A protein has these predicted regions:
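Residue immediately N-terminal to the catalytic "proton-acceptor" Asp
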Residues: 325, 330-331, 335
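Protein kinase catalytic-loop region centered on the HRD/HxD motif
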Residues: 317-327
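Conserved C-lobe activation region of Hanks-type protein kinase-like domains
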Residues: 399-471
Length: 517
């Protein structure tokens, strides 16, 4: 206990006192548990020990990183540790002090109450971690500089900075409002018959209720018949937290669809995330479906360039939201970007035509959360068998050696490939395309280039044609995504992966916001 008190003493008035008292009660509980003869005591002891270790690490970071820690944060910490103190005091009363040498059994009733307290402790740990995450990423007023870039105090730079700060504050509110134990997110099956049809170039299903004609979208997260219970429960935790994030998010600002909740279909070995259509939007199509449409190739580009830039910005913002919550997406591709047409206010043939593709791009949203996982969760490191998906993977993910587990910078590489496709308004999956499709195959044939050759081809496009198509700043963003933390950014590699990933995406967002057309 003394090590924690010494670590933060004098750094925050009021915080060390409540922390020391609270965690000393936790130590007292652990001493009393020694006298009990049940494996359950080991679980409770472990939770309390982890609680103390996490609190120690986080608090030392809070107050040693910046000596001017905001008073608001200090007040929040005092409130949080008062809650923790209440939990510990109730536990202390549940496990009376025994005489030396005595052994006591834990009754079923005591074990049941103990499990409830463990859930409360784990909830507290989760809430404390999220508050720490928000502080680490969003607690500083000054944003990090873009990699290989000097800050410019021009008009566009100031406006871009304000936009990024607005997004940062909005994400802060989302993370603060997310509760992984929220049970209301689970939708119960209803008896109304519905029809489900797959969206073209997508794993999503379009659902229509026969009576009300209400339409919504469903995304599946499946597990195998022989999955262990703990694997299924891990899926459940991820689905619940993703649903909560999407439920609380500002859909249009952040580029992710609002989620009504999820359904657990045990007979089908899957979870279903349910997404209603956003207001005044209709006719969803994946970006891949649009790019691969023969009509797109035949007629060419008819939408304004600024709309394509807005589409790119929305996708980057959506990825930032996911990374800020501590998740990796793992499938940043055009088939996981859903584009809605805007409904015409007064439908007529002319008005409707001008509000829809190809004259208008509509509104994009990032989808495809069926493989998303926490950034610190174990990675199966399975090879990708579909060549279309391989196009968007970084060389490290093809190599699959120790240390190549999927991380945030792999998402950022995939983002760079997607931004290339947006610039050319075509897809690398279109093998008939001389600009893109033929560049990823050897001699224009069916064999895909090696991962290293693909990266070189992408960089050549980013430095060659992209500046002419979208401007130099957009080209710089694409290059930054494809090169990741190379060169002068090597000094960031020793930092926490979550912090590096989110700071990097934040810098990319700022660079995109500086572009004016």
């Amino acid at each position: 206990m003394a090590d924690l008190a010494l670590g933060i003493a004098g750094l925050a008035v009021g915080v060390p006192g409540i922390v020391q008292v609270t965690l000393s009660i936790g130590d007292a509980i652990r001493r009393r548990l020694v006298h009990y003869e049940d494996d359950f005591k080991n679980l409770l002891d472990t939770v309390i020990r982890i609680n103390k270790s996490q609190s120690n690490d986080m608090l030392i970071y809070f107050f040693s990183e910046d000596q001017t820690t905001p008073q608001e944060l200090r007040d929040e910490l005092i409130e949080m540790f008062q809650v923790l103190r209440g939990i510990f005091e109730r536990l202390l009363l549940m496990f009376p002090e025994a005489k030396v040498g005595d052994k006591t059994k834990i009754t079923p009733a005591l074990k049941a109450r103990g499990k409830e307290m463990i859930e409360q402790l784990e909830e507290w740990n989760d809430r404390f971690f999220k508050r720490a995450l928000v502080f680490v990423m969003f607690g500083r007023k000054r944003l990090p500089k873009s990699v290989d870039e000097k800050q410019e105090d021009d008009e566009y730079g100031v406006i871009a900075l304000r936009k990024v700060e607005r997004l940062r504050d909005a994400i802060h509110k989302v993370l603060e409002g997310t509760n992984r134990s929220t049970q209301s997110l689970i939708n119960q099956p209803n008896a109304i018959d519905e029809t489900r049809t797959p969206l073209a170039h997508s794993s999503m299903q379009l659902c229509t209720r026969k009576i009300s004609q209400e339409t919504y979208l469903v995304e599946y997260r499946t597990y195998s018949d022989d999955a262990y219970e703990h694997e299924i429960l891990n899926h459940l935790d991820v689905v619940r937290e993703i649903a909560s994030i999407l439920r609380n998010a500002d859909a249009r600002l952040m580029g992710i669809l609002h989620c009504d909740g999820f359904l657990w279909e045990k007979r089908s070995n899957r979870f279903e995330l349910c997404f209603p259509f956003p207001a005044a939007l209709e006719k969803p199509r994946t970006l891949l479906d649009i790019l691969m449409d023969p009509e797109t190739r035949r007629t060419g580009v008819k939408h304004p360039l600024n709309q394509r830039l807005s589409l790119a910005k929305r996708i980057v913002r959506a990825l930032f939201v996911l990374h800020a919550a501590g998740f990796v997406h793992k499938q940043i591709r055009p088939d996981n970007v859903l584009v809605f047409d805007r409904a015409a206010p007064n439908p007529s043939s002319t008005e409707e035509e001008r509000t829809q593709y190809p004259y208008s791009l509509g509104e994009p949203f990032l989808i495809g959360f069926d493989s998303a996982r926490k950034v610190d969760a174990a990675s199966l490191m399975l090879p990708e068998k579909e060549w279309q998906k391989s196009l968007y993977l970084s060389p490290e993910r093809h190599r699959l050696q120790h240390g190549d587990e999927f991380q945030m910078h792999h998402d950022i590489f995939s983002l760079g490939v997607l931004l290339l496709e947006i610039a050319f308004w075509g897809s690398f999956q279109d093998r008939a395309s001389p600009q893109l499709g033929k560049r990823v195959s050897r001699d224009g044939g069916a064999n895909l280039r090696s991962p290293g050759e693909l990266k070189s081809a992408y960089l050549a496009l980013a430095k060659g044609a992209v500046p002419r198509l979208m401007g130099q700043k957009y080209a710089d963003v694409v290059t930054a995504c494809l090169t990741g933390l190379e060169g002068s950014a090597r000094d960031l590699e020793s930092e926490d992966g979550i912090v590096v990933g989110t700071r990097y995406v934040m810098a990319i967002i700022k660079k995109l916001e500086e572009i004016s057309i």
